[in-house]
Amino acid sequence: MNSTSNLIEQVIEAWQNMQAKTPLVQCITNSVAANYTANVLLASGASPAMIDNPYEAESFTKISSALSINLGTPTSEQMQAMQISAKTAQLNNVPWVLDPVGYGPILAWRSQMTDELLQFKPSVIRGNASEISTLAGNQVQSKGVDSTLSSDQAYQQAFSLLTHASCIAISGESDYILSNEVDAVIQVNGGSPLQPKITATGCALGALIAAYSAVTTPTIAALSAHIHFAIAGKLAANQAQTMGSFSSIFMDYIHMLDANLIEQYADVKLLNKQA
């Protein structure tokens, strides 16, 4: 059984490995999030590549350290690239993260494409509470791509998704990580209410999980990324209460995170699984 202290030690090791290895992360992401996502990865110590052309997808995925697929603003051409890259990642043991943005009956086309991508066994599925709950087969009132469900409600409904991925990460006021590797639900606290008001923070979080997955297991990757964001959000909120200032300082702390800050501020709890 993992203890919280042991998990935090593994997070510190993952952070150190990412700084040492600078993993190359292929991001097939949405037009709103691409720039912010790339900057978050650079600030974190990874190397982003926004390769979403189906004619280049296979060759680039083969040389990538990890793959992040985000369905925020999908085009037909992007969907082709997603399918090619996901299949290539599975065949070449490249860890990959699926972010099913907006999954649900209102956005039926992308949701069907998401269902098809599950066959390629993502390492981690990451989303907000509504997306994850709906993906798990529950009926949830939709509000575009924003969550109408709390994360503590959603994690109870998401265990079935562990047949598709090693790890499920649900973001919210508290974040929850379900895993085939750890016999508990991992709860991560911290962050700031201003984070979801900044465009693309959730999308960038998915890409950061992918970056960490290049240097550690899927569960520790998800935990590391969520802790990274939670600490940066908490410390930024101590210095700024308005969105513009918070956004800038948040990015600074994404860059300035180190082992001492992780050890000092990581707030992790282990909960019993209740499938």
From Swiss-Prot:
Annotated residues for binding of substrate: 50, 200
Keywords for this protein: ATP-binding, Kinase, Magnesium, Metal-binding, Nucleotide-binding, Thiamine biosynthesis, Transferase
Pfam families per UniProt: HK (PF02110)
Family annotation (InterPro entries): Hyethyz_kinase (IPR000417), Ribokinase-like (IPR029056)
Catalysed conversion reaction: 5-(2-hydroxyethyl)-4-methylthiazole + ATP = 4-methyl-5-(2-phosphooxyethyl)-thiazole + ADP + H(+)
Protein residues bound to ATP: 126, 171
GO biological process, one term: thiamine biosynthetic process
Cofactor(s) needed for function: Mg(2+)
EC number per UniProt: 2.7.1.50
Molecular function terms from GO: ATP binding; hydroxyethylthiazole kinase activity; magnesium ion binding
Pathway: Cofactor biosynthesis; thiamine diphosphate biosynthesis; 4-methyl-5-(2-phosphoethyl)-thiazole from 5-(2-hydroxyethyl)-4-methylthiazole: step 1/1
HAMAP family to which the protein is assigned, alphabetical: Thz_kinase (MF_00228)
Known function: Catalyzes the phosphorylation of the hydroxyl group of 4-methyl-5-beta-hydroxyethylthiazole (THZ).
Family indicated by similarity: Belongs to the Thz kinase family.
Protein name: Hydroxyethylthiazole kinase
Source organism phylogeny: Bacteria, Pseudomonadati, Pseudomonadota, Gammaproteobacteria, Moraxellales
